[in-house]
């Protein structure tokens, strides 16, 4: 889906403030972190998820030695977007209230739960906007082609895309960012709902996390 221009996101600046591009002067990385970053970014480059840039913007990327910042026991590259976020306009698309969502389930008996794999990465960034989604490590400067984690407005923009994409199913689907819950009154109607869901997933090239799927759970 990230290559579908119909779902490319924009990163508009505030109209009420002068925008001064900020280019981080990167502090030194220790040799182990730098080697790890180069390896990780080489993979992202080969997959087309980032690309070299000459943007006037640059946000510092670094590793944090905290358990909360680790992914499956491995260090996670963190990007400091605060300077860029200051200039970005707020996306006002509302995120649903989690407790209010469950009010729609009073008559539901059958459920299936899905989670999008690497959720935000499934949305591309408009070609003319990529120069804003930029980060650097020592001697390297890149821009994202997809929506990165941790960026301002990412949850709202992703919610908007998912609601638009799954609009035909919303009477029997709850969507909270990259989590989708399908619900039906009986197994027969749920089977039809799943067929519609998978057709949309396939037609838009959406990737689901198999590990987090919960299928045909009965109440």
Region annotations inferred by a language model:
Residues 35, 106-109, 120, 141-172:
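Conserved pre-motif C helix in the palm subdomain of viral-like polymerases
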Residues 49-52, 155-196, 201, 207:
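Active-site palm subdomain of RNA-directed nucleic acid polymerases
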Residues 85-92, 120-132:
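Cytochrome P450 core scaffold surrounding the K-helix E-X-X-R motif
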Residues 115, 150, 170-185, 212-219:
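Catalytic palm active-site di-aspartate
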Residues 89, 145, 205-219:
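A conserved non-catalytic segment of reverse transcriptases
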Residues 1-93, 140, 173-179, 183-185, ...:
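Reverse-transcribing Pol proteins
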